[in-house]
C-alpha cells in the first residue's frame, strides 16, 4: 500500500495489465510517501508516483519505508546468487528522495546501501510491547533468538536476558532444536522474545518450547515486521505463545492473538 501525505493511492489497470494511476498534485513544497509493502508491483507504482511528483515541481519528497523489501538477501554466497538488496537500493537511490526512513532493518547492509537514510526509533515500539506484556525486570527476562539479535537490542534495554543457539540441519536449513545461553531465573518467570522479523515463526516456536522447559510461564513475542505467513505457522496453535506484538509495517491480516502497534509517520 502506498500513501501520499496520508492519502492511499490505488492503481487501475489497462487491458494489457499495465498500471493506470491518477494523482492530483497539491501545490506544496514537500510530499511524504509511505510504502507499507504488500507486493513487488508497488515498486513500479512508487517509481511512477515519485517521478510524477518531481515533474509537477515538488522539491522535497520523503519516503517512509518501514519494512525494506529484499533485506534478507543482504549478501551473496555463490557466484549465481543475485544481490537483490543492492539492486533494489540502487533503484530507490535513483529516485533521489530527500530522506528515506526505515525501521529496524534486517542488517546494517541496508542502511549502508541507501542514500540519505534515517532509522526510525524501534525502542518506542518494544517499550510498548514490554508494557502491554506486563514483564518486569525484577523476575522476568527478555529472550533473543540468536546472538545477533542479542547484540542488536540488549544495549538498548536494561533487562535480564538470554539468547538462543540454533541447531540446524545444514543440508535443509531447517531448525532442529535450540540451546540457551544467558540468565535464566530459578523461579518460574515470564518472557518477552524480541526479534526484527517473523515469517512462519519456526525460530520462535522452538525458542518457546525450550523456554517452557526451563520454567517459563507466559511467553510473549515482539517482532518489528510480521509477515502474514505467521498465521499459517505453529505460533497460532495452543497457548505456547501467549501473545504477539508487531508494528503496522507489514502485517495486513488481523488475529486476536496479535496486537498491531501503529507506526508514527511525520508529515
Question: For each of these PLM feature ranges, what is it?
Answer:
Residues 1-267:
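PRPP-associated nucleotide enzymes
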Amino acid at each position: 500500500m502506498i500513501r501520499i501525505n496520508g492519502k492511499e493511492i490505488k492503481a487501475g489497470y489497462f487491458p494489457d495489465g499495465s498500471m493506470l494511476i491518477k494523482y492530483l498534485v497539491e501545490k506544496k513544497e514537500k510530499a511524504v510517501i509511505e510504502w507499507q509493502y504488500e507486493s513487488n508491483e508497488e515498486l513500479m507504482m512508487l517509481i511512477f508516483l515519485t517521478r510524477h511528483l518531481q515533474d509537477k515541481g515538488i522539491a522535497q519528497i520523503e519516503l517512509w519505508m518501514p519494512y525494506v523489501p529484499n533485506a534478507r538477501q543482504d549478501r551473496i554466497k555463490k557466484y549465481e546468487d543475485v544481490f537483490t538488496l543492492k539492486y533494489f537500493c540502487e533503484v530507490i537511490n535513483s529516485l533521489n528522495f530527500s530522506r528515506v526512513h526505515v525501521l529496524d532493518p534486517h542488517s546494517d547492509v541496508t542502511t549502508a546501501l541507501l542514500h540519505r537514510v534515517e532509522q526510525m526509533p524501534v525502542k518506542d515500539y518494544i517499550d510498548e510491547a514490554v508494557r502491554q506484556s506486563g514483564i518486569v525486570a525484577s523476575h522476568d527476562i527478555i529472550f533473543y533468538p540468536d546472538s545477533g539479535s542479542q547484540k542488536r537490542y540488549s544495549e538498548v534495554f536494561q533487562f535480564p536476558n538470554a539468547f538462543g543457539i540454533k541447531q540446524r540441519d545444514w543440508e535443509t536449513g531447517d531448525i532442529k532444536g535450540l540451546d540457551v545461553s544467558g540468565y535464566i531465573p530459578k523461579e518460574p518467570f515470564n518472557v518477552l522474545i524480541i526479534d526484527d522479523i517473523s515469517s512462519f515463526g519456526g525460530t520462535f516456536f522452538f525458542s518457546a518450547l525450550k523456554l517452557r522447559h526451563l520454567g517459563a510461564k507466559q511467553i510473549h513475542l515482539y517482532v518489528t515486521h510480521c509477515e502474514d505467513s505467521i498465521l499459517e505457522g505453529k505460533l497460532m496453535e495452543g497457548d505456547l505463545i501467549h501473545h504477539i506484538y508487531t508494528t503496522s509495517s507489514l502485517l495486513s491480516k488481523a488475529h486476536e492473538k496479535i496486537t498491531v502497534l501503529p507506526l508514527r509517520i511525520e508529515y
